[in-house]
Amino acid sequence: MGDSDDEYDRRRRDKFRRERSDYDRSRERDERRRGDDWNDREWDRGRERRSRGEYRDYDRNRRERFSPPRHELSPPQKRMRRDWDEHSSDPYHSGYDMPYAGGGGGPTYGPPQPWGHPDVHIMQHHVLPIQARLGSIAEIDLGVPPPIMKSFKEFLLSLDDSVDETEAVKRYNDYKLDFRRQQMQDFFLAHKDEEWFRSKYHPDEVGKRRQEARGALQNRLKVFLSLMESGWFDNLLLDIDKADAIVKMLDAAVIKMEGGTENDLRILEQEEEEEQAGKTGEASKKEEARAGPALGEGERKANDKDEKKEDGKQAENDSSNDDKTKKSEGDGDKEEKKEEAEKEAKKSKKRNRKQSGDDSFDEGSVSESESESEGGQAEEEKEEAEEALKEKEKPKEEEKEKPKDAAGLECKPRPLHKTCSLFMRNIAPNISRAEIISLCKRYPGFMRVALSEPQPERRFFRRGWVTFDRSVNIKEICWNLQNIRLRECELSPGVNRDLTRRVRNINGITQHKQIVRNDIKLAAKLIHTLDDRTQLWASEPGTPPVPTSLPSQNPILKNITDYLIEEVSAEEEELLGSSGGPPPEEPPKEGNPAEINVERDEKLIKVLDKLLLYLRIVHSLDYYNTCEYPNEDEMPNRCGIIHVRGPMPPNRISHGEVLEWQKTFEEKLTPLLSVRESLSEEEAQKMGRKDPEQEVEKFVTSNTQELGKDKWLCPLSGKKFKGPEFVRKHIFNKHAEKIEEVKKEVAFFNNFLTDAKRPALPEIKPAQPPGPAQILPPGLTPGLPYPHQTPQGLMPYGQPRPPILGYGAGAVRPAVPTGGPPYPHAPYGAGRGNYDAFRGQGGYPGKPRNRMVRGDPRAIVEYRDLDAPDDVDFF
């Protein structure tokens, strides 16, 4: 096994033997003379026998499984640690170890690494996607690392001592604003030509994208209304025990979205019948298997006697018929044999002809006599002509039969809800969607391409899904696309599996009446917000109302307020409470007063489910999962996953649980309910919003050049004029398209600027000095439950090398921003895989094992008085 402990420790031993080979040969010879049991003499035969017991002393917490090998009484000779050990390359570490090692270099398989500070190398390595680290993407230009914003303390060092505190704070705020503004402008210039960026912010592309999204939304709405009119939602409940019916409904929606008809929906019934037939067939086989051995011996004997009698009667009848059948069979066999003999003769003639043709090219072939060859060729030509005539007649007969079968084929329902798809993990940001479509269109059955949003932490690489018809051989297409490059980027597609669990459940507490009523309120609010945002039930601004088949108001929200108002019998409770009820201070004798039974209201649940299905089918929003599935119309599954209510909880629930569920659920829905955020006018001006008129004036001024007295040039056309006003007039008249381009560019930048959630590079914070709270026992950091993990993000540019004071996992390290949750940092020697955090340290504290990360087994020997008080400075 490649990942077993023995194999893994063997490779680690081999690694350190290679490191010592440059200066330890004399010591090895001495040890061999002393008769030490050294396994190096048997490189091939001794590999498997080399055990992890040789480093047993470095891991005292391990259990002994076998007797350790013999060693001499004297301690092993220690060697000096070389200065270059920290940066040594490890032949057994692949590029996969780098994100977890946290320190110096294993070999990288991507572009050649530049000379310079080791932290720059680490940062560049972590920024690359995995394909670049493995060599799939050639020659990626990493560019200059982004600048880091100064901390207030660093900023104060650049100021004069005469600047007071308030002025320093003001200047620092201005510095931060300028820094962010500059970063935003640099980001815009770096990505303005990329397709994903233009489709999001360029005025022309934004309009096209909105029209496409609106058309897809209208199509999904028509599908929902069609299914509702057909009664698909009448008896459908979003409970986990109705999973089969829910999947069938989702498939029906997908068939309708793909342009299917009512006839195509019949395939769902056929699939259901086939499944039931398969189940009944299996059940009948099991019953027969059980019933077979259950027959008694008496029954078997009786059956045997009856069979013998019947056989005796049949024997007489059969004897008279045997002669007739034998004759007929004999005649039939003779005819079949004749036909087979004729076919074989024809085949043999053809083979002989082919062989003779092939042999005629050989120098040593002996030709037959001319008369024989001519006669044979004439016969062969006749046979070929007859065969050709027969072949011509066959297609005509087939064509006559085709129209009869065509009517039956047209009626056959199509499985439009099933597709095949390929998944592409890394698509470079400079690759356009049209390029992928043109590449995949060459293969039959191509349907569509879906691209995910770019990921800033992965250099804005995107994931892609290419959908094909179900009838294609998807593995063959995947193989053909395997080694194709687009703009020096390997697509490396893989076959995308079908969804396994399309219906998933959440907590069954959602069946409670109080929660259902609250969900109706939230779902109605969500529908109202999404409909307004997409203007689904209103005509687009600036266009006359076009008569459509869609109603003017959402029929789903009709009379919804009837279910939002809770009816209470307050008067009755007041009268009963004041007259005969027990005082509220007195607790009941039995049961917990805070616990209640789960109360299910079928009427409310039916209303809620219709709202949730509207959200799922029309707006691609999974309510119980509190998430929106973006670009679902372009994905392989147009209606893939849905979350539903789980089974009813077996125990009583507390009132606090109900309130806590409602509170957390509303918090999760808040981002979906919020209107798209955009910067205010004041904030936009601070960030550098551009005025179109001013930018046009700048453009005209820059293209008005004075050559001399009364001599002005327009560089756009090369024409000369007597004055600047003539140049201006010329630009507006003859170069109006350039003016429009400037205005569009301004709108492009302003759209990006005003987006509060605009993409940006991951923020890299400066290294923080270690505080007293960071000095903890080895392996433990506040709020970090996983002491074995090391930073998976990138190291900041210019960060100093980690200090050497801590050999173990307790070394105090500067903070490394990763853009995610903080992780404890790698100890000294982490260039060899951060091994000390896994094995050494004498079992102090708990040491989780991880076989994927290999490292240094030579833990530092620690001397500690067990009776002394705790001291964190020991080695």
Curated annotation (Swiss-Prot):
Residues modified to Phosphothreonine: 543, 670
Phosphotyrosine: residues carrying this PTM: 8
Tissue specificity as recorded in UniProt: Widely expressed, with a preference for proliferating cells. Highly expressed in hematopoietic tissues and reduced or absent expression in parenchymal organs like liver and kidney. In the brain, expressed in the subventricular zone by niche astrocytes, ependymal cells and neural stem cells. In this cerebral context, expressed in slowly dividing cells.
Stimuli inducing this protein: Upon cell proliferation.
Effect of a null allele: Death around the time of implantation. Deletion in adults leads to proliferative arrest and bone marrow hypoplasia whereas parenchymal organs composed of nonproliferating cells are unaffected.
Omega-N-methylarginine modification, residue list: 832, 839, 849
SUPFAM superfamilies to which the protein is assigned, alphabetical: RNA-binding domain, RBD
Any one GO CC term of the record: ribonucleoprotein complex
Region (Disordered): 1-90, 272-411, 571-597, 834-853
Ranges annotated as biased composition (Basic and acidic residues): 8-73, 297-345, 387-411
Top-rank lineage group of the source organism: Eukaryota
Function of the protein: Acts as a mediator between the cap-binding complex (CBC) and the primary microRNAs (miRNAs) processing machinery during cell proliferation. Contributes to the stability and delivery of capped primary miRNA transcripts to the primary miRNA processing complex containing DGCR8 and DROSHA, thereby playing a role in RNA-mediated gene silencing (RNAi) by miRNAs. Binds capped RNAs (m7GpppG-capped RNA); however interaction is probably mediated via its interaction with NCBP1/CBP80 component of the CBC complex. Involved in cell cycle progression at S phase.
Quaternary structure annotation from Swiss-Prot or TrEMBL: Interacts with CASP8AP2 and ERBB4. Interacts with NCBP1/CBP80 and DROSHA. Interacts with LUZP4. Interacts with NCBP2/CBP20 and NCBP3. Interacts with MTREX.
Record protein name field: Serrate RNA effector molecule homolog
Organism: Mus musculus
